[in-house]
Amino acid sequence: MGFLYSQLFKSLPYPTGNYSGKTIVITGSNVGLGKEAARHYVRLGASKMILAVRSLDKGHDAKHDIEGTTKCADNVIEVWKLDMASYDSVQKFAARVVTELPRVDIFIANAGIAPGSYRTAEDNESSITVNVVSTFLLAALVMPKMKSTAATFKTRPTFTITSSDVHGHTTFPQKSAPDGQIIATVNDKATAEKIWDDMYPISKLLEVLGVRSIAEQNPASKFPVTINCVNPGLCHSELGRDFPTIGFWLIKFFLARTTEVGSRTLVHAGSQGEDSHGQYMSDCEIGTPAPFVTSVEGKETQDRVWNELVKKLDAIKPGVTSNF
């Protein structure tokens, strides 16, 4: 009932505010929620908007579209290459952020995939690489720039991950794997294909657990950057285009929010202060994650998963998790 009420009856506030002087980065912003969130931020006066995209051509199409509707100056929006399926691309992009941008006030890690079948990217099933490993690698790599932004400009930046309420739609059977083997079990092809419909929810659950881990180890009172995650609800977007079931498309047709309305949740989450640190944002307010997340078993699983993820991230870029 909560999902139906949220989708059909919850009114989300139209974004307001003044982002003059702010630099904002949004990944996965050539289409969908990321593009519409970028449009809102530019409309509200953002001084610099970085569209981080896999396809530069599509990114430039998005740039021209946003410029056409907002009438912003032609130097506000920049299009940068980022392929979340490649650790090398993530590191090169983050290096540009650190060296070329004077400040980063808001970072919306919106890029994500929901593949229709098993395939790999780097050393994981593709949705685990894109939605989880590369997302937290990116967070760790840009955190020094966001911390310096806080110190230099006396502000509190925000790093927001686009998650989903489907994080509660899985029992996460791989949690019973031996210590140090949860992510490896998630990546196992035979295991994944048996519960394929759970794979995207599992990736979203791992995002929620990761955000909570960072915040628990780095409380807002001692950490100058707010890190949260946001559930935009079911929206009309490119995500899910690989889903073949007619049931999914019928549900989307009748219940999905427009892309613009869904994007309001991203803009809201990115503008929140320390009260949202470590929180799961939903319907433009602090929400409640799935019961498993806050259970004793959920906390134990969170700690185990985070320990594994830290080792994986530090193997990609030695010492990178010390940036948190």
From Swiss-Prot:
Pathway: Secondary metabolite biosynthesis. The active site is at S163, Y200, K204. InterPro entries: NAD(P)-bd_dom_sf, SDR_fam. Its EC number is 1.1.1.-. It is an enzyme of class 1 (oxidoreductase). SUPFAM superfamilies: NAD(P)-binding Rossmann-fold domains (SSF51735). It holds the Pfam family adh_short. One of its GO terms (molecular function) is oxidoreductase activity. NADP(+) binds at L33, K58, D83, N110, Y200, K204. Keywords: NADP, Oxidoreductase. Short chain dehydrogenase; part of the gene cluster that mediates the biosynthesis of the dimeric xanthones cryptosporioptides. The pathway begins with the synthesis of atrochrysone thioester by the polyketide synthase dmx-nrPKS. The atrochrysone carboxyl ACP thioesterase dmxR1 then breaks the thioester bond and releases the atrochrysone carboxylic acid from dmx-nrPKS. Atrochrysone carboxylic acid is decarboxylated by the decarboxylase dmxR15, and oxidized by the anthrone oxygenase dmxR16 to yield emodin. Emodin is then reduced to emodin hydroquinone by the oxidoreductase dmxR7. Belongs to the short-chain dehydrogenases/reductases (SDR) family. This is Short chain dehydrogenase/reductase dmxR8. The gene is dmxR8.
